[in-house]
Amino acid sequence: MTATRTEALTDAGQKTVFKILAAISVCHLLNDMLTSLLPSIYPLLKSSFHLDFAEVGLITLTYQSTASLLQPLVGLQADRRPRPYSLAVGMGFTLFGLLMLSMARTFATILVAAAFVGTGSSVFHPESSRVARMASGGQHGLAQSLFQVGGNAGLSLGPLLAAFIVLPRGLSSIAWFSVAALLAMIILANVGSWAKRHRLNRTKSHATNAEQHATLPVKKVALSIAVLMALLFSKFFYLASLTSYYTFYLMSKFHVSVRSAQIHLFVFLGAVALGTIVGGPVGDRIGRKYVIWYSILGVLPFTLLLPYANLFWTGILSVVIGVILASAFPAIVVYGQELIPGRVGMISGLFFGFAFGTAGVGAALLGELADLTDINFVYLVCSFLPAVGLLAAFLPNLERAGLHTAQESPV
């Protein structure tokens, strides 16, 4: 297969636009902070609506399914006809879903609200990931890390806000967070204006800078994508056990309060944010394959220890697991973008969507497993998932193959 190598040529004369990266990261923080309110209030929803674990998992499945199924389609369409202003529209879906959730009186309403929130994420992630790459100035791993760390920071804030605002004041207090959604829409409208101007400038330079560059054979690319998807499955299925059921695990095994469990979840998600910061720049420096290999397989000893640890060591191990495991995702996304030049939106949508979908299916299946057995058994089973990291041995070394400069046509 061949691809147009242009970005490597034009990036050499461009600087990293940290102002845009910061704006996208802040909006990612706000988006994921708002969406993470949903799993953070599961204890409240479970008690208020008399739900079992399977129904809790169904809420997550509804949210993650709408996000995962739509994201690759949104990303592919964005590659063909970029619509930077769709970022603000996507945030509008999230806003509507939150307002619906704050007024929910039935389980069906909760599911519909979760679907709207998921749709907002499906629009936000592919296009914003494209914009982050546009502003990278060639430092793609760094840009992806800065973009993703905003999301991880938002995910860590969600449980904290739920613990200190929503849980004491009730479900209706979620409506207060509409202010954050409106702020994000304003910022994203300005980011969309910049992206439109940037794309026009790059299109003008494309005609003089384009040249052809051979990449990996189609079969090799397909195998590599399949391996990356398997690694994402391992990573996000395991993360689903923590993001959806970690609070229940702590309350069941160690008899801590809901607020204490939420704080533990906040610490874990903070560790995930730290790992995300590290993964991209390290991948730029030493190669993304090595980051992927270590971050998935290297976490295995710690996940195996977690089910047998006391409360103190559970907190420590969760931090170590969060840092190591999270470092993989920026490297995986950029690695995939380099495998298939010209399809930044599609790859971003595919990987983000698959991640959300895996988390949703994982949450539902683990909820069923917890109902059939107990929550402790769930973590015992999940502790072996990082062994899938052995598949990273089948990934080609793009840097050694000279493929790391193969990039997409102007975005």
Predicted regions and their residues:
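Cytoplasmic helix-loop-helix junction between adjacent transmembrane helices
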Residues: 113-150
